[in-house]
Amino acid sequence: MQQLAGNLEGVAAAALNCGSNDNTFRTRGLSGHILGGSKVQRAHPQTGDEGGACPGLAGATVWAGQWDVGDCAPVPVAGPDGHVTRYGLEWLAKNSYEGQKQQVVHPRILWNAEIYQQAQVPSIDCQRFLQTDEGLKEFLQSFLLYGIAFVENVTPTKEHTEIVAKRISIIRETIYGRMWYFTSDFSRGDTAYTKLALDRHTDTTYFQEPCGIQVFHCLKHEGTGGRTLLVDGFHAAEQVRLQAPEHFELLAKVPLRHEYVEKVGGCHNHMIGVGPLLNVYPWNNELYLIRYNNYDRAVINTVPHPVVRRWYHAHRALTAELRRPRNELWVKLKPGKALFVDNWRVLHGREAFTGYRQLCGCYLTRDDVLSTARLLGLQA
């Protein structure tokens, strides 16, 4: 048993020690009041929406009292209007800064080609994917863990590919339309509309927020080559973090401009997106987005020249890791096999090809994919 009075964040930090062997509740210097400007919110009983910070609650206090640490009784917090809110110690621990630093937001399995192939991740049959929550959940679990997933036995048309894509998300309309459909006809000012090989890259880095998920479906190929290249960018970045943390840190700090200028036929676009190559959550340094595209990277003029030189050294280290053959997963896309790619994580490319090759696909809104996963009980 221990007496306690303090601010809400202090209580949350103290709750991390709930259930320790000596049965004590370490308060870590609690002050007795919620600090000025702290937000204590009340949720609507039906909608769950928080109505914003209640004015005047900067003076709310955590009652001094005794709690049995063994059963983790709720901690009461009294507002100046007399309203009392009770917080469970488990909830306080989970939502404290110290608690968040220890948690992974998105559990993942980082992979190279050998790791992925040995995992023998199954594809999902189209009908099971479309008609059952179990099939959908299995697909999303694979997608969240590995950043790629396949649906088999899809009717090879743009219309049926759209039905499959909309199973997990709203389609994100971009300058390429909703469902894009392309061959090597140079109809757009993009290297994808050629027969040339494409190096590994993130798509739409020139958007302020790159598209979250990309869908590919090869409808027809009468020729040779054209295999799809997939590389886990997070695995490569983690190798850089382990071998040269100063490179990782620099790539996560220096903002870059990516630019796309198109003047082909009736398509006139000038897109610019700005952001670091590696994006991390500031509280736990967890990587959540890689923005790697040497085709669309613009002039680096956002930092002093000495930093630019250091950045190129760091970029060279990451590029070397991304281009290691052991990190390259090559997949031959065929009619009936749709590929979903986490564009924030997995880089994709293509080998050169001959003959007539026809692909369709789209971009999906990331928020809706993650929402679908959470509604099925997955951590996303």
Language-model region placement:
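Active-site environment of non-heme Fe oxygenases that use a 2-His-1-carboxylate facial triad
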Residues: S96-E98, V105-I148, N153-F340, W344-A380
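Fe(II)/2-oxoglutarate
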Residues: Q2-Q141
